[in-house]
From Swiss-Prot:
This is Beclin-1. It is found in: Cytoplasm; Golgi apparatus, trans-Golgi network membrane; Endosome membrane; Endoplasmic reticulum membrane. The C-terminal evolutionary conserved domain (ECD) contains poly-Gln-binding domains such as the ATXN3 poly-Gln motif, consistent with structural docking models revealing two highly scored poly-Gln-binding pockets in the ECD. As some binding is observed with BECN1 lacking the ECD, other domains of BECN1 may also interact with ATXN3. The coiled coil domain can form antiparallel homodimers and mediates dimerization with the coiled coil domains of ATG14 or UVRAG involved in the formation of PI3K complexes. Plays a central role in autophagy. Acts as a core subunit of the PI3K complex that mediates formation of phosphatidylinositol 3-phosphate; different complex forms are believed to play a role in multiple membrane trafficking pathways: PI3KC3-C1 is involved in initiation of autophagosomes and PI3KC3-C2 in maturation of autophagosomes and endocytosis. Involved in regulation of degradative endocytic trafficking and required for the abscission step in cytokinesis, probably in the context of PI3KC3-C2. Essential for the formation of PI3KC3-C2 but not PI3KC3-C1 PI3K complex forms. GO terms for molecular function: GTPase binding; identical protein binding; molecular adaptor activity; phosphatidylinositol 3-kinase binding; protein kinase binding; protein-macromolecule adaptor activity; ubiquitin protein ligase binding. Pfam families: APG6, APG6_N, BH3. A motif (BH3) lies at residues 106-125. The keyword Nucleus applies. Keywords: Acetylation, Antiviral defense, Apoptosis, Autophagy, Cell cycle, Cell division, Coiled coil, Cytoplasm, Cytoplasmic vesicle, Endoplasmic reticulum, Endosome, Golgi apparatus, Isopeptide bond, Membrane, Mitochondrion, Nucleus, Phosphoprotein, Ubl conjugation. Residues 110-157 are annotated as: Interaction with BCL2 and BCL2L1 isoform Bcl-X(L). It is a peripheral membrane protein. Residues 47-72 are annotated as: Disordered.
Length: 448
């Protein structure tokens, strides 16, 4: 209960729900409770219980309390619960309100009504498992729960009744049959228990085997993971090696292509390109000769002679030929021939022009000596190839080259007492003979 002072002459008292603690507004009927109403509310739950003659009176005489009687009706056990003593003035829950009021009698009546109401709630709480008072919602919820319990109890009661009726209808033969069935069921139970024990033993064995298998499976999983890591590492290495192998194969393929290309390449033809430019014979684009209409610089003529000496020297080395009387010394635009009979004698294959050119015959001797070397090369080739023949016949003693297939004239390779046109033509015929010799060497020593 909770109380608050609303005014100097009025005391408000309220009760709260024992479940949700919400304040309650009591019904007006609680204000007009009389003794008869209170006795009806506090009457025992079961009023049909009858005690055995003599026992009830004896208990009432001995104890002075209302009896606790258990009766049976229709196979249902019923118990009589005596009511609680409400009107005891010694109750521990009694109280008296003291407050200011204009009328002392009014306060006394209020205190009495509240005491009666509180005692009534205490009695109701003592007779049930539920504390009172309750609000309307909690009461509805409680009633629903009680209805559910009542339905369950009624169903149990009906089941008990049916079982009792079945037992009453059974005769002695049925009882013996049930006893036999009970023994059989007991034996079946023992057998099943034994099977259960065997199954339990087998389960333990299987559990132990399962643990071993799980441990083995875990070990295998670890090994599999290790093998997988190793496999991944080896796979990575394999991929790297495959890439390297493909790279090497591509390099080898490219090198093989270059090698095949080089094998098909004529080194002499690629190095020494002999051709003509008008009336001039050319080697590597250097003109060999001089005309009044085309005064070629002597530096270009000297360079052409250097390439010519280098070509004949390379052809002789390829054939293993050693020239008699002279040794070729390729030295760029200052190449020369060295006399084998007189080591101190050098025959230059280069000239600077001027007046000295007309009086110095060493240049002419060098060109005649070079023509001698070309003749020796021709004779060496004819030793192994009788059908070999150069297009222009060479006369070393006279220092001339004959145009046997053309006009039939001969042209001197010397510059003294010779025109520039004939000298240039003689040099052109000499380059043509060297081109034929170059072609023969390339065909014979291509794969050597």
């Amino acid at each position: 209960m909770e109380g608050s002072k609303a005014s100097s002459s009025t005391m408000q008292v309220s009760f709260v729900c024992q479940r949700c603690s919400q304040p309650l507004k009591l019904d007006t009927s609680f204000k007009i409770l009389d003794r008869v109403t209170i006795q009806e509310l506090t009457a025992p739950l079961l009023t049909t219980a009858q005690a055995k003659p003599g026992e009830s009176q004896e208990e009432e005489a001995n104890s002075g309390e209302e009896p606790f009687i258990e009766t049976r009706q229709d196979g249902v056990s019923r118990r009589f619960i005596p009511p609680a003593r409400m009107m005891s003035t010694e109750s521990a829950n009694s109280f008296t309100l003291i407050g200011e009021a204009s009328d002392g009698g009014t306060m006394e009546n209020l205190s009495r009504r509240l005491k009666v109401t509180g005692d009534l709630f205490d009695i109701m709480s003592g007779q049930t498992d539920v504390d009172h008072p309750l609000c309307e919602e909690c009461t509805d919820t409680l009633l629903d729960q009680l209805d559910t319990q009542l339905n369950v109890t009624e169903n149990e009661c009906q089941n008990y009744k049916r079982c009792l009726e079945m037992l009453e209808q059974m005769n002695e033969g049925d009882s013996e049959q049930l006893q036999r069935e009970l023994k059989e069921l007991a034996l079946e139970e023992e057998r099943l228990i034994q099977e259960l024990e065997d199954v339990e033993k087998n389960r333990k064995v299987v559990a132990e085997n399962l643990e071993k298998v799980q441990a083995e499976a875990e070990r295998l999983d670890q090994e599999e993971a290790q093998y997988q890591r190793e496999y991944s590492e080896f796979k990575r290495q394999q991929l790297e090696l495959d890439d390297e192998l493909k790279s090497v194969e591509n390099q080898m393929r490219y090198a093989q292509m270059q090698l095949d290309k080089l094998k098909k390449t004529n080194v002499f033809n690629a190095t020494f390109h002999i051709w003509h430019s008008g009336q001039f014979g050319t080697i590597n684009n250097f003109r060999l000769g001089r005309l009044p209409s085309a005064p070629v610089e002597w530096n270009e003529i000297n360079a052409a002679w250097g390439q010519t000496v280098l070509l004949l020297h390379a052809l002789a080395n390829k054939m293993g030929l050693k020239f008699q009387r002279y040794r070729l010394v390729p030295y760029g635009n200052h190449s020369y021939l060295e006399s084998l009979t007189d080591k101190s004698k050098e025959l230059p294959l280069y000239c600077s022009g001027g007046l000295r050119f007309f009086w110095d015959n060493k240049f002419d001797h060098a060109m005649v000596a070079f023509l001698d070397c070309v003749q020796q090369f021709k004779e060496e080739v004819e030793k192994g190839e009788t059908r070999f023949c150069l297009p222009y016949r060479m006369d070393v003693e006279k220092g001339k080259i004959e145009d046997t297939g053309g006009s039939g004239g001969s042209y001197s390779i010397k510059t003294q007492f010779n025109s520039e046109e004939q000298w240039t033509k003689a040099l052109k015929f000499m380059l043509t003979n060297l081109k034929w010799g170059l072609a023969w060497v390339s065909s014979q020593f291509y794969n050597k």
